[in-house]
UniProtKB/Swiss-Prot annotation:
Upper lineage: Eukaryota, Fungi, Dikarya, Ascomycota, Pezizomycotina
UniProt keyword list: Repeat, Transducer, WD repeat
Identification of the protein by name: Guanine nucleotide-binding protein subunit beta
Top-level taxon of the source organism: Eukaryota
Gene field: GB-1
Family of this protein: Belongs to the WD repeat G protein beta family.
Species name: Cryphonectria parasitica
Region named Disordered: 1-36
Repeat in keyword set: yes
UniProt xrefs under CDD domains: WD40
Presence of keyword Cell division: no
Sequence ranges of the WD repeats: 69-99, 111-141, 158-187, 199-230, 242-272, 286-316, 328-358
UniProt record, GO biological process: signal transduction
Amino acid sequence: MDSQRPNDVSPEAMQARIQQARREAEGLKDRIKRKKDELADTSLRDVAHRSHEAIPRNQLMKTKRTLKGHLAKIYAMHWSTDRRHLVSASQDGKLIIWDAYTTNKVHAIPLRSSWVMTCAYAPSGNYVACGGLDNICSIYNLNQNRDGPTRVARELSGHAGYLSCCRFINDRSILTSSGDMTCMKWDIETGTKQIEFADHLGDVMSISLNPTNQNTFISGACDAFAKLWDIRAGKAVQTFAGHESDINAIQFFPDGHSFVTGSDDATCRLFDIRADRELNVYGSESILCGITSVATSVSGRLLFAGYDDFECKVWDVTRGEKVGSLVGHENRVSCLGVSNDGISLCTGSWDSLLKIWAY
């Protein structure tokens, strides 16, 4: 019997054990992938080419509104559930609530830190949140101080790294992701952390709450993995591999069974939770730049992706083909989102503009 304790193991021996464990893990992953490939008697792309007609390339959205008001790079935007309002965050130090119908500013909220990276609208429309390099998630109540500046209602401090993404569960709870490789669930009323989700090995860049089951959410990180989390259990229940570089964006499909990701490897990918595997890849040899943001149409047939080359590219989800590009920004498309009714797409850019697109 080996009586050697872990404390007696030399650093070299420990490193050798770690490398051996990694090799075994990679071998097991390859075996699992081969087994899944054996069971897959067809592909989504093959089925779609047999049963779905191609989407006409001349039926692309056009710019209907341009929202001007920010004075620096826009890093994030998020639609309200009322389909009319949206919030945007810029490094000019402002959080702006917009009326997308009229292009008017409803609120212009000065931020304590201009290094903002994310923002979110509560489903009720009562609150917005933001955060960034200050490591803090700041909550603002839109129903207070209507005649004066909107002030911080709550500051949620607990992350050891920058805040990369935040999404409200309801008016009482919010999820955040961070460069400290964790996600957290917070109680907004008390300002306390309820659950910490730790399993990634790189900065967590994006999260998306399941639209049909608020007990689960997904995350994408710089370890190139996407994970499905059970909020009640406080742990990851599925891990999805396929990307070859950082995952910058992740978004659930409206049905809650699938999700899309966007990565620095210049591809978007479709994963299915029930099949526990990747179903499609969206990319081409001519696309070399990374993806900053992703969203799907309400039907799930179209995938919108923001790229570093100033374009929002549109993909046919089932056939895996590029339908076209939405061109109009003069710098990186940093964020985008589809309104709840599916009629409008909003894109935000480093050119300081937001554009509303529709048919």
